[in-house]
Amino acid sequence: EDIELIALSHFHPDHSAELPAILWPSGSQARLSGPTGDAGFPSVAEFLERLFGKNGAFPVFADRVQFDVLTVDTASRDIVDVWNVSDFLVRGIGVPHANVPTIGYRVDVGDASIAFSSDQNGSDPSFIEFIQDVDVLVIHMTVGEDASGFGADLHAKPSVWGQMATQGEVGRVLVSHISTPSPQVLQTRLGVLRDNYSGPVTVGEDLLCLEVN
């Protein structure tokens, strides 16, 4: 009942598979945002229909939840107001994640701001403009500096994250979506990040609370 908005970035399973479990206890109405589709991936409206429609995977939702859906055109790179209530503003923009339609988000609440990179390779300078001067940038530390091929097309290297944070003049970087189980590998990647960004870096963990001001 406390969830006002579910902002979906893209439709890889690790970013969308838990949606039925999140919505199951609440019922009634759900406000969601998500990407446009393409030949390989559904739009947010198509995704919801395939999951919750009368002929979907969970047809029990068809009469249980009413969806209020906003679609962000990820191909245009235009900034879209996703939710604007009082002093709470959520905006989305398309970001480059290989061939996957993907949204990065920015949340401004009063004077505080947080940006969520989502999965992306960091090749579009419009995202740096989008995150300018945020208090916290949440990044996905998924590949190392030696990434190549399709992996590098999907995900930004640690040096790229650092350069983006520096150019965006962000107040703090919060590292999430950590793919390696090795503490040594993680420290190496964090070292490259810090070589390219001089601000504070926090490594995310379950139940972490971070003050934003």
Regions found by a protein language model. Give the residues of each.
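Cap/insert and terminal regions of metallo-dependent hydrolase folds
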Residues: 113, 121-208
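Binuclear metal-dependent hydrolase catalytic cores
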Residues: 1-114, 191-194, 200-212
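Short hydrophobic beta-strand that contains or immediately precedes a catalytic carboxylate
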Residues: 117
